[in-house]
Amino acid sequence: MARIAGVNIPTNKRVAISLRYIYGIGPAQAQKICTELSIPDERRVNQLSDDEILRIRELIDREYRVEGDLRREVAMNIKRLMDLGCYRGLRHRRGLPVRGQRTHTNARTRKGKAVAIAGKKKVTR
């Protein structure tokens, strides 16, 4: 397995597919990296030379924020919103949807498992 940006990428897959295993690199960025370094689409990771792997590694380190740095940046952005006390920060703090989705029904992923409410107690006369 080739190791790029601290991630072991699979060797039997195509380069553009394998690069997606790195957090912060999606389909468009992976394709852009391959075209920028003139790596053919059908080339697999185990067919790359050490020089090509080194060029990919250097390009990603130089041009992209990936893995820990990107996760830290996203977490800091969310923390900043929460510290500001703005609407989005309050929604993050309460664990509710941030982008305007309805919450009367749905939003179970964000709110967690539904808690059953005990039915009304019957009053005996």
From Swiss-Prot:
SUPFAM superfamilies, per database record: S13-like H2TH domain
InterPro entries (UniProt xref): Rbsml_uS13_C, Ribosomal_uS13, Ribosomal_uS13-like_H2TH, Ribosomal_uS13_bac-type, Ribosomal_uS13_CS
UniProt-listed PROSITE patterns: RIBOSOMAL_S13_1, RIBOSOMAL_S13_2
GO cellular component annotations of the record: cytosol; small ribosomal subunit
Keyword annotations of the record: Ribonucleoprotein, Ribosomal protein, RNA-binding, rRNA-binding, tRNA-binding
Lineage: superkingdom: Bacteria
UniProt KW Ribosomal protein keyword: yes
GO molecular function: rRNA binding; structural constituent of ribosome; tRNA binding
ATP-binding recorded as keyword: no
UniProt GO BP: translation
Subunit description: Part of the 30S ribosomal subunit. Forms a loose heterodimer with protein S19. Forms two bridges to the 50S subunit in the 70S ribosome.
Primary role: Located at the top of the head of the 30S subunit, it contacts several helices of the 16S rRNA. In the 70S ribosome it contacts the 23S rRNA (bridge B1a) and protein L5 of the 50S subunit (bridge B1b), connecting the 2 subunits; these bridges are implicated in subunit movement. Contacts the tRNAs in the A and P-sites.
NCBIfam families per the UniProt record, alphabetical: uS13_bact
Similarity remark: Belongs to the universal ribosomal protein uS13 family.
Protein name: Small ribosomal subunit protein uS13
Lineage: Bacteria, Pseudomonadati, Pseudomonadota, Alphaproteobacteria, Acetobacterales
Name of the coding gene: rpsM
